[in-house]
Amino acid sequence: MKRLLKIGVLGAGHLGKIHLRCILQADQVYALAGFYDPNPDTSRETALQFNIRAFPSAEALIEAVDVVDIVTPTPSHFALAEKAILAGKHVFVEKPLTRTLEEAQQLIQLSRAHRVQVQVGHVERFNPALLALKGQDLNPMFIEAHRLASFNPRGADVSVVLDLMIHDLDIV
């Protein structure tokens, strides 16, 4: 029988809950070990909602898993990813990877030194509208992007470039 990768999620906010749902549905690939969220109320509610283990700390979760899924505010990405990599764990980080290029380069160097994978969640790559363009013979000379959505303050910990425009830049 194939051994499933044990994965743990750091962060149980809006996106963290989406990640938890997706991991639970991918039960042929992953065994969800649980999650950690620093907010005790969020932690308690999420554990009950998903019937999963709430770890007492990020460190306890990192120690218990093969893969760490980081779905926390961007300013915490670097420190959490660094801890996971130094512990020899593979890391999936919701975009953006870090706040700065220097931090991202440090994580890349660390991941190579510790022989672990680091992946960034650029979900727009899997948008059906974008996938429909595959195979088309396109030679764009100018690209203009518009986001038609109301402002959501939950992503205000980083600039609009790192929060939203990063998808457009990734696609280009």
Give the predicted meaning of each segment:
Residues H19, F50-I108:
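Beta-loop-alpha module in the N-terminal Rossmann-like domain of NAD(P)-dependent dehydrogenases
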Residues A33, D66, M141:
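Conserved acidic residues
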Residues M1-Q49, V172:
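N-terminal Rossmann-like dinucleotide-binding module
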Residues T98-G155, D168:
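A contiguous active-site-proximal alpha/beta segment in oxidoreductase catalytic domains
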Residues G155-L162:
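Glycine-rich "substrate-gating" loop/helix at the edge of Rossmann-like oxidoreductase active sites
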